[in-house]
UniProtKB/Swiss-Prot annotation:
Its main location: membrane. Keywords: Cell membrane, Lipoprotein, Membrane, Palmitate, Signal. A lipid is attached at C12 (N-palmitoyl cysteine). It comes from Escherichia coli O6:K15:H31 (strain 536 / UPEC). The keyword Membrane applies. It is found in: Cell membrane. This is Uncharacterized lipoprotein YsaB. One of its GO terms (cellular component) is plasma membrane. It comes from the Bacteria. Residues 1-11 form the signal peptide. The keyword Lipoprotein applies.
Length: 93
């Protein structure tokens, strides 16, 4: 009986393997196209030129991408893309 309890405890004491998020390298051409589309959409939303839009961050999630940026007036926004890089929406922050 003690042997069975000991074996049960040994099985419980081993920590589960650490899972790490998979990072897929984004094609540079795709990310440049996404940035251009984000700048275009932000310029339309904020009624300004694309040259006055700065994209400052690019984040990859499990099934989507986000690009963060701001206008020359320091208005912040986030562009969201699906897993294939298609534009979903622009959120003002």
């Amino acid at each position: 009986m003690a042997l069975m309890v000991l074996m049960a405890l040994v099985g419980c004491s081993t920590p589960p393997p650490v899972q790490k998020a998979q990072r897929v390298k984004v094609d540079p051409l795709r990310s440049l196209n996404m940035e251009a589309l984000c700048k275009d959409q932000a310029a339309k939303r904020y009624n300004t030129g694309e040259q006055k839009i700065d994209v400052t961050a690019f984040e990859q999630f499990q099934g989507s991408y986000e690009m963060r940026g701001y206008t020359f007036r320091k208005e912040q926004f986030v562009c969201s893309f699906d897993a294939d890089g298609h534009f979903l929406h622009l959120s003002m922050r």
